[in-house]
Amino acid sequence: MNMYQLLERTAQTYPDNLYLVREGVKYKDFVDLVKARAASLDKAGIKKGDVVGILSHNIPEFPISLFAIWYLGGTVLLLDTNLTPFEYENMTATTKCKIVCAEKSFFFKTDKFTFYDITKKDGKINPDLKPAAVESLDYATLSFTSGSTGKPKVVPLTHFNMVECTNSLESMAEWIRPGDYLYGFLPMYHVFGFGVEILATLHFGAGVLLQPTVNPKEIMADFKKFRPQIIPAVPRLWEVFRNKIIDNVKAQKKWWLVSFILKYGKTLQKIGLGALVRKVQKPILDVFGGRARLLIAGGAATKPEVETFYERLGLTFIQGYGLTETVGPICISKPTKKRFPFAFGAPTLNNECEIRDKNEDGVGVLWLRGHQVFGGYLDNEEANKEIFDERGFFNTGDMVTMDKNGELHFAGRKKQVIVLDSGKNVYPDELEGMYIVLPGVKNVAVFEHKVKGKTVTYGVFSVEEGMTLEKLGAEIAAANKKVASYKWVTHFAMTTEDLPLTSTQKVKHHVVRQNLVEGKYPDRHE
């Protein structure tokens, strides 16, 4: 089965369920919209095997175009909306993408590929245009996981990978039901947003309420009007919501009562005071529309106190673990079990794990194998040899432990990928390659660091004599313009000493970071 066939199956099973909630589009009507878009893209010259980019916010035309490209047998290149023209040109060149479906606001002059207005109105369905014969192992999507410059890592996911991911989501059937509304403000180009807003809704016959911007006023208005049952978000947003709720309650001078209910609510329910508990909880739950049943966190670790807050309000709060290489959620937590520190459950259906090279605390490297695990980076045999063993297990590079219940607990990242508070990933290799060529720079280490309690992308530069912070800052700022702003190094230190290296001449990032903490690099811009 391929992804378009899966859509047709869901539309036949739940024809009158809303898929695009805000627009009032039912599943049966969504299929017609996909067919009409497929006819338009066919006229534009797209054929089976072509790579077609999508560069768009969360608007209805995103999923319509996605399934239309699959209808024609194409592969979708998912493009981050926060990048630069330079990066888009590199990505399309690497993947041989000749056409990009985009909102007009993203258009720029280029001879590398052609833009197609994703909001363009479609004509009639072409009855002679049938779905392409797409095999389960054909590529469905391509995504970049290591930046667009240098030797990029492009993740191809097959239709088999995605269909199996939807099947594995059956483990969430206790909380997601046909006809539910899922709030969709996570970007669909990212694997977390794609997994919940495309795959999960498709599996359960649920609807998605697309929100193209993260505007608090619009989000609150949507919660009130549409009252979604399922709300996924990155941990940072769950923390923001929690803090605002607490601030509002304190402003009403009711925190003493709410904190008492949060602490003793379960006990009060057991002794017959459930009505009181619900009365206190109701105004808070109404913030989410009053029907919220399931809150989902992913993309980074959630603070225990944040998760506890929502669970004590009577909401189910689950966390997942996944990578682009695993179609997102390959592990899902069980809300009935104690999961601190951050735990993300066990592998889902038809997936398995091994923890290797454990230390004395039981912390080891997580390896995964299964139906959701991709087959290797596109045209990058060197990288593939490093991450797959002879038995087909994939090295995630993440450090975990396993508890007595078989649940995995996140212990840290062996890889140096920087995870910002927003959940966005920054790849040090890409930035180091960009900064190492700057005048006066001998070497550089980029890593995750805390500045005034905030996670930032930090750089330590080994420079030649005579370099000043002001001059280095100007060089860095000029280089930053090549990449998206969330990747920028704006906090840095410099030294005229050489950075510590391994025997293979690689920078020892952990030593550099420790030196920074110990104050060995006093020349800083923070």
Question: Would you name each region that the model predicts?
Answer:
Residues 20, 44, 64-67, 71-135, ...:
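Structural core segment of the AMP-binding/adenylate-forming
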Residues 26-28, 140-166:
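Conserved AMP-binding A3 loop
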Residues 16-45, 50-59, 67, 84-89, ...:
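Conserved AMP-binding/adenylate-forming core of the ANL superfamily
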Residues 231, 276-408, 414-417, 442:
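Conserved AMP-binding/adenylate-forming
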Residues 163-181, 191-283:
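Conserved AMP-binding/adenylation subdomain of ANL enzymes
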Residues 418, 445-450, 477-526:
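Conserved C-terminal "lid"/linker of ANL adenylate-forming enzymes
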Residues 100, 370, 375-376, 399-485:
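AMP-binding/adenylate-forming catalytic core of the ANL superfamily
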Residues 18, 126-144, 151, 175-181:
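Conserved pre-ATP/AMP-binding loop-to-beta segment of ANL
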